Amino acid sequence: FGESKAGEICGGRTELRISNEKEDSRRRGELQTVRLDNLLEDARISLGLDRVPKQMKGLKKLTSRNQTPEAVHKGILRAKFNLPVFRDGTIRFDMSDVPVTHFTPEEIHVDWQQLKHLGYTTDCFGNELKSNDQMLEIFPQDFILAKSGADYFVRTAKYIDELLVRFYGMKPYYHVDEPKDLVGHLICALAPHTSGGVLSRLIGFSDSSGGYAHPLFHAAKRRNCDGDEDAIMLLMDGLLNFSREI
């Protein structure tokens, strides 16, 4: 874990070894001394960056049983886009739950043509969707994000794309430059006291600080929809970065 000389890394896999006295312990990790400067330099070279961000934040301690740290590359890229991290490795945004059943395209700052492409072909009266002031019935799986979270998830999407390209050696996925590019992408929503995320689709942005969605959607997260605070994350973030081992 870290080399005496920066740039010299084996690229192999380290298997977990558990001492006898730690086998049945709540925390299996062992205190170690590592060359953090070399770890960061190795990661910088691997990512193809000219320099690492001036300020990076990390957890004081790992809370899982095996206490396995994530790749430092992810922390470097998150810091590049000024993003925080939850203790499971994902990037979340918290909002108060606000039930909604109907909306107009202009209320969520999305053109009717884009909503029609997402399946909103008629308004709540059965008329063909042709303007931004028609009233639509929200689908149970769709989500309207607080406008304050729009830039946050633009930066998150850019982080995910850089992570795919620089760390995983794959093609970018989101190609997001502005908030409207997020419309139609999948998210994962969850309440703090439940163990499963609920799949959803981002369809627009509200001027309030709450997260608007169908009552059934909020109830799926937490069994009710009484205005409590829940979190959402980009689905690709959860698929790539969620870990029970951190």
Put a short name on every predicted segment.
Residues F1-I246:
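Conserved core architecture of multi-subunit DNA-directed RNA polymerases
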